[in-house]
Regions:
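Short, glycine-/small- and polar/acidic-enriched structural segments
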Residues: 1-117, 123-126, 142, 146-149, ...
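Conserved C-terminal helix/tail region of periplasmic/extracytoplasmic solute-binding proteins
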Residues: 258-287
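Pocket-lining segment of extracytoplasmic ligand-binding domains
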Residues: 125, 130-220
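Structured segments of extracytoplasmic/periplasmic soluble domains
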Residues: 13, 32, 36, 51, ...
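Stable alpha-helical elements in mature extracytoplasmic
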Residues: 6, 25, 29, 48, ...
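Short, surface-exposed acidic
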Residues: 19, 119-122, 223-234, 270-279
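Secondary-structure end/capping motifs
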Residues: 187-268
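Short, solvent-exposed loop/beta-turn-alpha elements that line the ligand-binding surface or hinge
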Residues: 4-16, 93, 167-171, 240-255
Length: 287
């Protein structure tokens, strides 16, 4: 997808200029959509999407962007703290950095359940991943939950993963990023939405066939080639058929995740939806 962004494939297919904007979190993506600054959010975490629709935001989920294990989203605990999964309850009473309302927030909650630590007894400091990793290295927090290769790499300079990628997988902790679109843009430009999704899936097919240019992707991500290969190696880009039959279908993996997360992050002001299928559509997925 990043390769096609740099090669202006999207502009050529859509027939209009495309303004690409990077955001630190999926919550910032939502805010930009609601303010009218952007029309489509690619690789928005499922957690910020759920928070948005619980708050009645006029957006829809139109595609699965990427599936990932906890290589790209994880909790890193300070080596100096002496805390590991074996004595994780010692985090209680300590400061931890978490970008609230993101997939890292979901991973934080699920990881604490898996290691038997009470997250309600920790002082949670809301920090974007870049700041959280610096806080961990500086000794300001005992643990930082993060996403993004650069932030995790920085945190690992002075910390270790609370759970390995395999341990997180065994605990049922996994991530899904999605593509969401504002209701207004979807209604006014359905053809553009369809083209955007189609070009994305063409890029995914090329990646799955081993034909992506990782040098271009590494440059765009501001990472070295080895780190890029390592991070992308933990990503999965399902095709449209798989998404329709296993993820966005009734009882599918994505729909179950929406229900679980919707209730996990529900508040009295923004309760969980009774039916999340109302904010999901498969109409733009390739045949």
């Amino acid at each position: 997808m990043q390769e096609d962004k740099l090669k202006v494939t999207f502009e050529k297919a859509l027939g209009v200029p495309v303004k690409w904007t990077n955001f630190a979190t999926g919550g910032e993506m939502t805010e930009a959509m609601l303010s009218g600054d952007i029309d489509i959010s690619y690789s928005q975490g499922l957690t910020p999407f759920v928070n948005a629709v619980n708050a009645k935001a006029p957006i829809k989920l139109v595609d699965v962007a990427v599936l990932y294990g906890m290589g790209g989203t994880t909790c890193v605990v300070s080596n100096a703290s002496g805390i590991t999964k074996a004595n994780a309850s010692q985090l209680e009473g300590q400061k931890v950095a978490v970008p609230l309302g993101t997939m890292a927030d979901y991973v934080f909650r699920e990881t604490m359940k898996a290691v038997g630590a009470d997250d309600s007894k920790m002082t949670v400091v809301d920090m974007v991943p870049e700041d959280g990793s610096v806080a961990l290295v500086n000794g300001d927090v005992a643990m930082a939950c993060l996403f993004g290769g650069k932030s995790i790499e920085k945190a690992l300079e002075s910390g270790s993963r609370m759970l390995s990628v395999d341990e997180a997988k065994a605990a049922g902790i996994a991530g899904i990023d999605i593509t969401s679109v504002t209701d207004k843009f979807m209604k006014e430009n359905p053809g553009m939405v369809q083209t955007f999704v189609e070009v994305t899936h063409e890029a995914n097919a090329r990646h799955n066939a081993g034909k992506s240019d990782l040098n271009i992707i590494a440059k765009d991500a501001e990472m070295d080639l080895a780190a890029t290969k390592g991070q992308i190696g933990g990503f999965e880009f399902p095709n449209a058929s798989t998404i329709k039959s296993k993820y966005m279908n009734k009882g599918g993996i994505l729909m179950n995740y929406l229900d679980v997360m919707g209730n996990m992050f529900a508040t009295s002001e923004n309760p969980a939806l009774k039916d999340y299928s109302a904010v999901v559509t498969t109409e733009f997925l390739p045949m």
